[in-house]
């Protein structure tokens, strides 16, 4: 049985990934890729936190000044690792494609939050699709089919018969 804190983080990960997919698939939505990336980064962070808690590890920043283990607190709560730190701790010296995908999206998220960017939708479809498929793969590997998203997500309907080259390429990847 999973610790409650791991289940709570999994619930947050599920909610964020579903909200991200909804935002991306909403017809006529502006900034769909921007919203998707921000929500997927939240989902991935919560997923990694759930993995660490499942494995008995606290994904919290430690104070460096004491001999005993002490944690950094913000607003009376331990400061959790952000996604970049989770990637370092989880993958360590390995650099699989999913890590590269997430590092790219983390850097892009910072730009989305702090600068104006041109329309990203056509160019980033493949990266967005990879982030979703990689999320589902890691979720299944770490927690099993019981926690899979495949039952809650559906393939979105399309209004057009034509498929932009980026979408066609992404569909061939998986």
Residue map of PLM features:
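Charged alpha-helical initiation segments
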Residues: 1-37, 156-160
